[in-house]
Amino acid sequence: MTQLAIGEATPHGATYDGHGVNFTLFSAHAERVELCVFDSRGNERRYDLPGRRGDVWHGYLAGARPGLRYGYRVHGPWQPVQGHRFNPAKLLLDPYARRVEGELKDHPLLHGGHDEPDYRDNAAVAPKSVVISDHYDWEDDAAPRTPWGKTVIYEAHVKGLTYLHPELPQEIRGTYKALGHPVMVAYFKQLGITALELLPVAQFASEPRLQRMGLTNYWGYNPMAMFALHPAWASSPEMALDEFRDAVKALHRAGIEVILDIVLNHSAELDLDGPTFSLRGIDNRSYYWIRDDGDYHNWTGCGNTLNLSHPGVVEYACECLRYWVETCHVDGFRFDLASVMGRTPTFRQDAPLFAAIKACPVLSTVKLIAEPWDIGEGGYQVGNFPPPFAEWNDHFRDAARRFWLPRNLTTGEFACRFAASSDVFKRNGRAPGASVNLLTAHDGFTLRDCVCFNQKHNEANGEENRDGTNSNYSDNNGKEGLGGPLDLMERRRDSIHALLATLLLSQGTPMLLAGDEHGHSQHGNNNAYCQDNALTWLDWQQANRGLTTFTAALIRLRQQIPALTGNSWWEEGDGNVRWLNKNAQPLSADEWQNGPKLMQILLSDRFLIAINATLEVTDIVLPEGEWRAVPPFAGEDNPVITAVWQGPAHGLCVFQRG
């Protein structure tokens, strides 16, 4: 290897061209940048990056090849109040690193200093960036591009989904390989989902607090390297990228999209007492929102907040997203705490990152789903994201639970949420698919726990049950816990069926939490972010097969109803929907607001959803015509009904006109 040539300012990161590697690093406030490369024995050699174009430092190392381990030492002022925390004693990860060797351990050498710099060198324990070649044969891969109106999302954790699956080869359980295995692909197809939404797969770290407690960050919302796949779910770290792409390719062949949950709102550097391993040491002032006293704005609850209005950070975020689309062929993203994306620092629909995504021909055409809040002032922004974003609809989640479990909710409020929350999303040219309807997600109770627990039980998380929400809108049906007498178990089953039908037969984009179709329980833990164990892993051998069949039949039924798949707003008289009372008459104003929870929803003039959310068996008069119950509500003896359905308590049935 020779001294660095000046190289080029683009592309960003470390790029192998067959003869050497071009290195770039963005830092608006650095005074000097050293590239540090390591041999197999850990010996370090340093090179100054000789080029600078604007705020991008660059250099070219001839003869360097994939597999080279490297990092940066960045020189500049230590002025904490001004937000500058440069410390060349700390080896730093490339923010664009495609692979990382080593974990982020709770080690004193990884701290850069609080009021004063920590000048102890950390190279011996710091994680290191690794140069890769990302060549891959995609063969004839093509994105499914499922229309929003036909999309059914399945939210899952890479490890937890398959780790206990008995039909998968032992060595691939809980890995990227398992996602594309024929056993899993066949299951997804049988269930009927069209998109697999994965909890974070970018490399993440366990917070020092968890490490000291003997726990790990299981969910992955603590990002360490946004361009690198988490290596623990691959057969070996160097195979992670190809194994993930193999899975994407297999899923695409089956017509299933892959959506990534991505964390652009904060980094694993946490607060000022957290480790300095990348952005803080590269350009703290540019990458993070800094308060007047030099500390961080903590709008994420994780200690820091990325400044996604800074031009350099906007470019970083967009290149990260494009990398996953162009190099890994993913079909979209779910953005964690997405209100941070629109902060300037107040939330704006024309914020720089939103504008950049909208203008990008790659990113503007994939599925974009916002978790439309953060914990800062003005952070709750449900309904306010610009096209082409869809959003998680917590109004739907809470209304569905309150309607069935049972809570005080009017028929009018339920109908509004059933109709894609038009009062929230029917603006700026958005379609009903912008409302991502959910009953549950990774964060909160599972569906089974919603009918078995009134209180959270998070003691295993080590925070004395203080963590996790207290607003669960759940109902244990008279007994806290999973067991109980037969009549109680039947009530719970009926509530689960009614909730699933509400989710999968409502207008908008449904999202199903993996395991809800099995009856998976986390034993009342509604914040299992640090539980990498049997509490969160899906137990396929104990799965409720009847519930899985019921769920699959609901999804098939959904795809047959034009009013649900058309992705256009329902208008009075358009034949898409009619709202009827228990006597098959239009609901009166009083019934909308004060009536019992009895109603009928006629979709596409031939599919009738009859609802009895009361505690009593009630006769419901069907509209004129011959009606027959449809799967999964049809039994072996499925007579034509022409007059009255005897609706059981907490009951729901779907009929099709003969």
From Swiss-Prot:
Annotated active site: D336 (nucleophile), E371 (proton donor)
EC number of this enzyme: 3.2.1.196
Site (Transition state stabilizer): D443
Keywords: Carbohydrate metabolism, Glycogen metabolism, Glycosidase, Hydrolase
MF (Gene Ontology): glycogen debranching enzyme activity; hydrolase activity, hydrolyzing O-glycosyl compounds
Pathway(s): Glycan degradation; glycogen degradation
Region feature (Disordered): 459-486
Pfam families per the UniProt record, alphabetical: CBM_48, GlgX_C
InterPro entries for the chain: GlgX_C (IPR040784), GlgX_Isoamylase_N_E_set (IPR044505), Glyco_hydro_13_cat_dom (IPR006047), Glyco_hydro_13_N (IPR004193), Glyco_hydro_b (IPR013780), Glycogen_debranch_bac (IPR022844), Glycogen_debranch_GlgX (IPR011837), Glycoside_hydrolase_SF (IPR017853)
SMART domains linked: Aamy
Catalytic reaction equation(s): Hydrolysis of (1->6)-alpha-D-glucosidic linkages to branches with degrees of polymerization of three or four glucose residues in limit dextrin
CDD domains: AmyAc_Glg_debranch, E_set_GDE_Isoamylase_N
A biological-process GO annotation: glycogen catabolic process
UniProt family annotation: Belongs to the glycosyl hydrolase 13 family.
Physiological role: Removes maltotriose and maltotetraose chains that are attached by 1,6-alpha-linkage to the limit dextrin main chain, generating a debranched limit dextrin.
Name the record gives this protein: Glycogen debranching enzyme
Gene that specifies this protein: glgX
